[in-house]
């Protein structure tokens, strides 16, 4: 170890000692970057750890990740009592799992301290107890829709072109599921538990993807009361339109259009989210946009589901029907060039698996330029990577 490294270690130890004086506890919010005390502690571990120790730690952590997901699916974490302990035999009987298999799985998580083993019994740590509750319901879909396929990425790239998926129907996800040629939503529609997990995850990261508070939708209001003001392309069950109409009552429901697949629109009708007057229009966003001269075409959580080629294709379906003052509003994470957040980093790897992509400002500029659009403004939510790219027709 060099003198510079030793000096840095000593400086970090001093910083951590100072931070400990004001440390009030860790953050309990999911998918947020750690507080300075934790970040500095992790930096210290990285600095003092040898490459061999790093590799060993990584192997154990990878195995622990798979084991924790398995214990959740076997209902093991949910069966360990919240207080006290349970024997291996009782745990095996309660979960209908072979005792020797359980013993081997639990050996991994007792080694890491995730589960506590004392006097022949197994009990929760404060961390595993959280996984037995709501946290487990957030961890599971991240594993199922991200890690599960990503562990096969080296194999996938060895038999495919070494590039991003050009088409979401031929992605790491569809390949891993053995269903290439099908859309992601088609595959997931046969897996209700995993679909429910995705919805649960989406709801719990909503604070990182706010609907309003950073873009002035009132400027879209048109003097022409017959002109469509807000077309929500791939808008799901209507949450976005509902939130915008509540925050900007000067926009009339009759001037809003919700576009999506037929089954999604049927859900929008049954939930009762949308105020009367909003138009519902069945539409495949990779085909020609049916609403002409709208003031704004809005895409939230759509662009990141698509690779560059498919996003350009989508945008090119909108450009021919835009008016001179029409806008395209893309609501997504806009990644920082350096030091992206935990949330966007994880999200990008999940999107990589399904043929989508989180993008930097430059990535967006390139895609928009190819589609015949230019950026007019970038509107970030305060303190977040999330924001709206406001684009208009490019001038020749």
From Swiss-Prot:
Keywords from the UniProt entry: Methyltransferase, S-adenosyl-L-methionine, Transferase
Phosphoprotein listed as a keyword: no
Keyword check for Transmembrane: no
Catalysed conversion reaction: griseophenone D + S-adenosyl-L-methionine = griseophenone C + S-adenosyl-L-homocysteine
Broadest EC class assigned to this enzyme: transferase
E.C. designation(s): 2.1.1.-
A GO term, aspect molecular function: O-methyltransferase activity
Protein's pathway: Secondary metabolite biosynthesis; terpenoid biosynthesis
Residues that hold S-adenosyl-L-methionine according to the record: 234-235, 260, 284-285, 300
Biotech uses: Griseofulvin is a spirocyclic fungal natural product used in treatment of fungal dermatophytes.
SUPFAM superfamilies: S-adenosyl-L-methionine-dependent methyltransferases, Winged helix' DNA-binding domain
Disruption phenotype: Impairs the production of griseofulvin, but accumulates the intermediates griseophenone D, griseoxanthone C and griseophenone H.
GO BP: any one term: methylation
Alphabetical list of InterPro entries matching this protein: COMT-like (IPR016461), O_MeTrfase_dom (IPR001077), SAM-dependent_MTases_sf (IPR029063), WH-like_DNA-bd_sf (IPR036388), WH_DNA-bd_sf (IPR036390)
One Pfam family in the UniProt entry: Methyltransf_2
Lineage top rank: taxon: Eukaryota
Biological role: O-methyltransferase; part of the gene cluster that mediates the biosynthesis of griseofulvin, an important antifungal drug that has been in use for a long time for treating dermatophyte infections. The first step of the pathway is the formation of the heptaketide backbone by gsfA which is initiated by priming with acetyl-CoA, followed by sequential condensations of 6 malonyl-CoA units. The resulting benzophenone can undergo a spontaneous dehydration to form norlichexanthone.
Family: Belongs to the class I-like SAM-binding methyltransferase superfamily. Cation-independent O-methyltransferase family.
Protein name, UniProt field: O-methyltransferase gsfC
Gene responsible for this protein: gsfC
